Amino acid sequence: MFRCGGLAGAFKQKLVPLVRTVYVQRPKQRNRLPGNLFQQWRVPLELQMARQMASSGSSGGKMDNSVLVLIVGLSTIGAGAYAYKTIKEDQKRYNERVMGLGLSPEEKQRRAIASATEGGSVPQIRAPSHVPFLLIGGGTAAFAAARSIRARDPGARVLIVSEDPELPYMRPPLSKELWFSDDPNVTKTLQFRQWNGKERSIYFQPPSFYVSAQDLPNIENGGVAVLTGKKVVHLDVRGNMVKLNDGSQITFEKCLIATGGTPRSLSAIDRAGAEVKSRTTLFRKIGDFRALEKISREVKSITVIGGGFLGSELACALGRKSQASGIEVIQLFPEKGNMGKILPQYLSNWTMEKVKREGVKVMPNAIVQSVGVSGGRLLIKLKDGRKVETDHIVTAVGLEPNVELAKTGGLEIDSDFGGFRVNAELQARSNIWVAGDAACFYDIKLGRRRVEHHDHAVVSGRLAGENMTGAAKPYWHQSMFWSDLGPDVGYEAIGLVDSSLPTVGVFAKATAQDNPKSATEQSGTGIRSESETESEASEITIPPSAPAVPQVPVEGEDYGKGVIFYLRDKVVVGIVLWNVFNRMPIARKIIKDGEQHEDLNEVAKLFNIHED
């Protein structure tokens, strides 16, 4: 009895300041509880009855009083523990609020998601049972469609269902500007400084732009809601219904599929063991950028496999970083030069030399045969017998369109290009549209295509949104794409750009203003498609006073700036503007006209490449 009383007394001494509102002190009574340890508590009726029985002289005497003390003691401990827990939780919430002061909305969103997913617990946000506009996928195409729908129908209710835990964001800075940031917290803030010095977030909009998915059906003026971390696993086209991976169902009136793609791997890596796979990055998302940035500070060697846009951009970014860190950066690919599938051979070779000057060890004509582990390092064996030792691998060898919904939805997959096969209005069915990387569409000028670029996601998403609200417009606006190999070399392209096509290139000497940095300063944005997409050239005329255009340079010359025309049946179907910026409307008009040109040197005058 006295041990119990002593324990309770100890708790009382520590908890009295915390629980003053829990009990009241009564006047002193003659018949106090044994041990004289407690003030009298307000207790439940059952305990009051027990106390009355103990003090009435009923049989049991000391034993009954002992039981009462035990019961009251346990009640004291429980009440004290509850009060202590409540106060600690209040203090924790207060500290979290203080810690959150000064954080950007994007960082608050990221921390909230990270906190919610710790230990596998995900907050259960109830999806609405019905929405007028359902967008599957949370990338650029879906966001462009949502904005387009709301522009044409200001009261529209739009729900985006995204497997990605992040809100919609732009991908180009993940392989470009973010790597050149001086901010040590760039992986947390995801803010980057453009070449013109302006700060920008990779998120299209802050969390405050979106409405709650649960509240979406009841909001008077509509809005855009995003369900993150959710995947649509079943599509019923006839029933206008989808099923999510959590079992919930959503019916819709109009649906857009913008599921994007998944980075391709290499068969040699797929065959390798778990350690090789754990030390390989398939670069695509914010999480991949964060992981690779951390890895680049911890290892001595990184090998980038892939010589296209993404591979070359990442290699240059890591190479420039290596000049300060000393990390070895290797890039290998099967083509003869960087971007060999896009650029004519002479320009591909010149570009490769430029990449080398960024601090990258470039290995062309390299086909990976196997990847293993030797002496704690990764060992890449090439088909020609060469071996490459490295600490980490980054694969950038293209995308595989996400078309799983074709099976349950009964949608057609294009056998040549992959992706959902849609018409010129981007329709797969009367109530289903597809946009972005996953759409294999019919281009009324260039034929059937599938494009994996940011601006195409913007253009196709916007068109799909317009058509979902009744526009019935075909795909005719040619999207563009761009690539920067650091701040000094960049190009913009449009149409069918394939090195297997005949090309004609016209070049001139570059000036100090002919680089991506200057282009950004002029346009005000590093996402150059934002300034070029809306522009149109209404009329093309060749100025009679334009200076004469020299002959095409030969191998080994310096290709400072120029225009490369890609031909099919003597018609220009693609154009690359090499260090020539803010001229995309002219290129777009040339492709749209689809005419044969006797002298492309004259056409090159339209781009004013000889102006200082």
From Swiss-Prot:
Provide the record's note on post-translational modification.
Under normal conditions, a 54-residue N-terminal segment is first proteolytically removed during or just after translocation into the mitochondrial intermembrane space (IMS) by the mitochondrial processing peptidase (MPP) to form the inner-membrane-anchored mature form (AIFmit). During apoptosis, it is further proteolytically processed at amino-acid position 101 leading to the generation of the mature form, which is confined to the mitochondrial IMS in a soluble form (AIFsol). Ubiquitination by XIAP/BIRC4 does not lead to proteasomal degradation. Ubiquitination at Lys-254 by XIAP/BIRC4 blocks its ability to bind DNA and induce chromatin degradation, thereby inhibiting its ability to induce cell death.
Q: Where does NAD(+) 1 bind?
A: G307, G308, F309, L310, E335, K341, G398, E452, H453, W482
Phosphoserine occurs at which residues?
S115, S267, S370, S523, S529
Q: Which residues are recorded with the post-translational modification Phosphothreonine?
A: T520
Q: Which residues carry this modification: N6-acetyllysine?
A: K387, K592
Q: Where does the transit peptide lie?
A: 1-54
Chain residue ranges for the region called Disordered = 512-551
Q: What is its EC number?
A: 1.6.99.-
Q: Where is the composition biased (Polar residues)?
A: 512-528
| Residue ranges listed under propeptide | 55-101
Q: Name one GO molecular function term.
A: electron-transferring-flavoprotein dehydrogenase activity
* Motif Mitochondrial localization signal, residue range(s) on this chain: 1-30, 62-88
The listed locations are: Mitochondrion intermembrane space; Mitochondrion inner membrane; Cytoplasm; Nucleus
- N6-succinyllysine is carried by which residues? K108
**Where on this chain is Nuclear localization signal (motif)?**
445-450
What Gene Ontology cellular-component terms does the record carry?
A: cytoplasm; cytosol; mitochondrial inner membrane; mitochondrial intermembrane space; mitochondrial outer membrane; mitochondrion; nucleus; perinuclear region of cytoplasm
Q: Which residues bind NAD(+) 2?
A: W195, E492, N582
Which residues does the record give as FAD binding sites?
Answer: 137-141, 163-164, 171, 176, 232, 284, 437, 453-454, 482
Could you say what the effect of mutating K254A is?
Abolished DNA-binding without affecting binding to poly-ADP-ribose chains
Family to which this protein belongs:
Belongs to the FAD-dependent oxidoreductase family.
Q: How does it assemble?
A: Monomer (oxidized form). Homodimer (reduced form). Upon reduction with NADH, undergoes dimerization and forms tight, long-lived FADH2-NAD charge transfer complexes (CTC) resistant to oxidation. Also dimerizes with isoform 3 preventing its release from mitochondria. Interacts with XIAP/BIRC4. Interacts (via N-terminus) with EIF3G (via C-terminus). Interacts with PRELID1. Interacts with CHCHD4; the interaction increases in presence of NADH.
Protein function: Functions both as NADH oxidoreductase and as regulator of apoptosis. In response to apoptotic stimuli, it is released from the mitochondrion intermembrane space into the cytosol and to the nucleus, where it functions as a proapoptotic factor in a caspase-independent pathway. Release into the cytoplasm is mediated upon binding to poly-ADP-ribose chains. The soluble form (AIFsol) found in the nucleus induces 'parthanatos' i.e. caspase-independent fragmentation of chromosomal DNA. Binds to DNA in a sequence-independent manner.
Q: What is this protein called?
A: Apoptosis-inducing factor 1, mitochondrial
What species is given as this protein's source?
Mus musculus
